[in-house]
UniProtKB/Swiss-Prot annotation:
Chief location bin: membrane
Function (record text): Involved in succinate export with YjjP. Both proteins are required for export.
Name recorded for this polypeptide: Probable succinate transporter subunit YjjB
UniProt xrefs under InterPro entries: ThrE_2, ThrE_Dicarb/AminoAcid_Exp, YjjB
BP-aspect Gene Ontology terms: succinate transport
Protein origin, superkingdom: Bacteria
Quaternary state and interactors: The transporter is composed of YjjB and YjjP.
């Protein structure tokens, strides 16, 4: 993939990630003045995950690093705009949730219950379930670490 193709794919990824970030921000009753920042943070998070995955990291570690970046930026923006960090961060990480892995695991479990046990279905179920669980864990831990680190009262060392 050339540089131009990568930049176009990155721009497309970031624009498409901003749409569900704004949608979920509206569902969570985020103030109107913060909607554009939720969209920007959602696209920054998803774009950084794409860059990390393109550079060779797997999806779990890329999601962890991207959610840490989203948490850090959200804390800084909350200080600037006098809002809680969750106003910006929660809606911004939702586009990174593992919908395809969770859906594939669910479909595999339904097929196992209908057709009976088969090893390929069980491998598909476990692989996708563990991938989805790891991504959700990476999102939650990565989003909480910047708050634990930056709001710490005692010395870090």
């Amino acid at each position: 993939m050339g540089v131009i193709e990568f930049l176009l794919a990155l721009a497309q990824d970031m624009i498409l990630a901003a749409i569900p970030a704004v949608g979920f921000a509206m569902v969570f009753n985020v103030p109107v003045r913060a909607l554009r920042w939720c969209a920007l943070l959602g696209s920054i998070g998803h774009g950084s995950r794409m860059i990390l995955m393109t550079s060779g990291l797997n999806i779990e570690w890329s999601t962890f690093m991207a959610s840490m970046l989203v948490g850090t930026i959200g804390i800084q923006w909350s200080r600037w705009y006098l809002a809680h960090p969750k106003v910006f961060t929660v809606a911004a990480v939702i586009p990174m949730f593992p919908g395809i892995s969770a859906y594939t695991a669910m479909i595999s479990s339904v097929k196992i219950s209908q057709l009976g046990y088969s090893e390929p279905l069980m491998i598909t179920l476990l692989t996708n379930f563990l991938t989805a669980s790891s991504i959700v864990g990476a999102l939650s831990i990565g989003l909480s670490i910047p708050g634990l680190w930056l709001y710490r009262k005692r010395p870090r060392v």
